[in-house]
Curated annotation (Swiss-Prot):
Acidic residues bias: start-end ranges: 181-199
Family membership noted in the UniProt record: To rat SBP.
Protein name: Prostatic spermine-binding protein
Keyword Glycoprotein: yes
Organism, as annotated: Mus musculus
Length: 199
C-alpha cells in the first residue's frame, strides 16, 4: 500500500506537467480565482531579454498573486465587458519567450518575442479561457503554461463542469422539497444552505 501511495505521489507532478505547453520542468502552479468572477485581465512581466518572467490574472476586480517573478517591465491587457480569450499561442526556449492572446472580439495582444518552440491552444467552439496553470523557475521565469477552458451560460457565468453543476442543483432541489414537506416541524435554526465557504 505504501508503495502505491509513493508512486501516486511521484506521478502527480508528471501528470500535471503533461498538460503544460513549453517546458514541463520547474515548480508547478495553478492560478485560483475563478470563484471571484470571470477572467477580466492579465499582467505580463517581461525580462530585459523579453522572455516571460511572471504574470498576474484579474478575476472580477481582484488581481491574483504574481506567478513567476515580478519585474519593472510589465504590460496589462484588460478585457472589455463580454470579451473572452478564445485562443492562446506562445513560444518557449528555456523560458516562455512569448504569449499571444486572441479574444472573441478580434483583439490580439502579444507579449515577448516569438522564438523557440511554438505552441497553440484553444478550447474549441464556444469555449473561453477560465484560468491557467504551469511551471516556473523561482526567481527566473515562467517555463511552461497550460490552459483551462470553459463555457459561458445564459447568465454570463463560467461553466466547466456541467455534470457536477447539475448534480449540485438536483441535491439543492431535493433539499427544498424536503423542507416544504417538513414545514410543520421545528426548525433547528441552522441555515447551512445559505452559508458559503469564503476560504
Amino acid at each position: 500500500m505504501l508503495l502505491l501511495l509513493t508512486l501516486a505521489f511521484l506521478a502527480s507532478p508528471t501528470c500535471r506537467a503533461q498538460n503544460v505547453l513549453g517546458n514541463a520542468a520547474g515548480k508547478y502552479f495553478y492560478v485560483q480565482g475563478e470563484d471571484q468572477g470571470q477572467l477580466k485581465g492579465m499582467r505580463i512581466f517581461l525580462s530585459v531579454f523579453k522572455f516571460i518572467k511572471g504574470f498576474q490574472l484579474q478575476f472580477g476586480s481582484n488581481w491574483t498573486d504574481v506567478y513567476g517573478t515580478r519585474s519593472d517591465n510589465f504590460i496589462d491587457f484588460l478585457l472589455e465587458d463580454g470579451e473572452h480569450v478564445i485562443k492562446v499561442e506562445g513560444s518557449a526556449v528555456i523560458c516562455l519567450t512569448s504569449l499571444t492572446f486572441t479574444t472573441n472580439k478580434g483583439r490580439v495582444a502579444t507579449f515577448g518575442v516569438r522564438r523557440g518552440r511554438y505552441f497553440s491552444d484553444t478550447g474549441g467552439s464556444d469555449k473561453h479561457l477560465v484560468t491557467v496553470n504551469g511551471m516556473h523557475a523561482p526567481g527566473l521565469c515562467v517555463r511552461g503554461i497550460g490552459f483551462k477552458w470553459g463555457n459561458i451560460n445564459a447568465n454570463g457565468n463560467d461553466h466547466y463542469n456541467n455534470k457536477e453543476d447539475k448534480a449540485d442543483n438536483k441535491d439543492a432541489d431535493n433539499k427544498d422539497a424536503d423542507n416544504k414537506d417538513d414545514g410543520d416541524e421545528d426548525d433547528d435554526g441552522n441555515d447551512d444552505d445559505d452559508q458559503k465557504d469564503e476560504s
